[in-house]
Amino acid sequence: MRTLWIMAVLLVGVEGHLMQFENMIKKVTGRSGIWWYGSYGCYCGKGGQGLPQDASDRCCFVHDCCYGKVNGCDPKDDFYVYSSENRDIVCGEDNPCTKEICECDKAAAICFRDNMDTYQNKYWFYPSSNCNEESEPC
C-alpha cells in the first residue's frame, strides 16, 4: 500500500512533456521510467546532488546537464514531437528548442537501456542524505 501511495505522489508531479519522457523510456527499455527511475540514486527524480552512484544514475546526471543547456523553452513543461519504430526514437520538430528537449530525453532513454544491467535495487529510493559528495561539473 505504501508503494502505491509513493507512486501516486510521483505521478502528481508529472506534467507536460515529462509524461512523454515516461512513454519514451517505456518504448526504449520496456520499463516504466516513473517506477524504475522516478527516485533512484542521487540524480534520478526531483533534484540532484553529490556523485552519481552507478551508470544508471549517471544517465540521470547527464540528462540533468542536458536540460541545463536548453535555452528558450521549459524542458519540464514544453511538448515535443517524436516518433518511434520498434525501439528507435526519432525526434522531429521545426522548433529547435523543443527538439533539443527531445534529444535530451532520447539520449537518457538509450542510456537507461544500455545500462539496465547496472541497476541496483539498493539505490531505489536512495536517501538524499547519502548524496553528500561534491558534485562534478556537467
Curated annotation (Swiss-Prot):
Q: Kindly provide the name given to this protein in its UniProt entry.
A: Acidic phospholipase A2 6
One GO CC term, this protein:
extracellular region
List the CDD domains hit by this protein, alphabetically: PLA2c
Any one GO molecular function term: calcium-dependent phospholipase A2 activity
Q: List positions binding Ca(2+).
A: Y43, G45, G47, D64
In its UniProt entry, the species of origin is given as: Craspedocephalus gramineus
Function, in words: Snake venom phospholipase A2 (PLA2) that has high lipolytic activity. PLA2 catalyzes the calcium-dependent hydrolysis of the 2-acyl groups in 3-sn-phosphoglycerides.
Keyword Transferase recorded: no
Q: Which cofactor does it need?
A: Ca(2+)
* Expression by tissue: Expressed by the venom gland.
Q: Where in the cell is it found?
A: Secreted
Recite the UniProt cofactor note for this protein: Binds 1 Ca(2+) ion per subunit.
Cysteine pairings via disulfide bonds: C42-C131, C44-C60, C59-C111, C65-C138, C66-C104, C73-C97, C91-C102
Instruction: List GO BP terms, alphabetically.
Output: arachidonate secretion; lipid catabolic process; negative regulation of T cell proliferation; phospholipid metabolic process
Gene3D superfamilies cross-referenced by the UniProt entry: Phospholipase A2 domain (1.20.90.10)
Subunit structure as annotated in this protein's UniProt entry: Homodimer.
